[in-house]
Curated annotation (Swiss-Prot):
Keyword Cell cycle attributed: no
Gene Ontology MF: a single term: acylphosphatase activity
Domain of life: Bacteria
Principal EC category: hydrolase
Residue stretches making up the Acylphosphatase-like domain: 5-92
Designated name of the protein: Acylphosphatase
Keyword vocabulary terms for this entry: Disulfide bond, Hydrolase
Length: 92
């Protein structure tokens, strides 16, 4: 499989519920690099890079609601080309 990067925006009750940290754990478990960060509008932005199948697994996890404490209402995503190399999955 080829390597890909996506950027996703997750909306709903996704801040203050451990969403970024649980996403980081899941992404690292899948061998992905990238980041998760809170945005001012209450959403979370996630960039994930790695094997296509693993990125798709993370996207499915996000769309299925992420951590139990969160309530995901909507996930938008598109292909992404990061400006620099991502060597780990971080919280921003």
């Amino acid at each position: 499989m080829s390597k890909i990067c996506i950027i996703a925006w997750i909306y709903g009750r996704v801040q203050g519920v451990g969403f970024r940290y649980t996403t980081q754990y899941e992404a690292k478990r899948l061998g992905l690099t990238g980041y998760a960060k809170n945005l001012d509008d209450g959403s979370v932005e996630v960039v994930a890079c790695g094997e296509e199948g693993q990125v798709e697994k993370l996207m499915q996890w996000l769309k299925s609601g992420g951590p139990r404490s969160a309530r995901v209402e909507r996930v938008l995503s598109e292909p992404h080309h990061p400006s620099g190399e991502l060597t780990d999955f971080r919280i921003r």
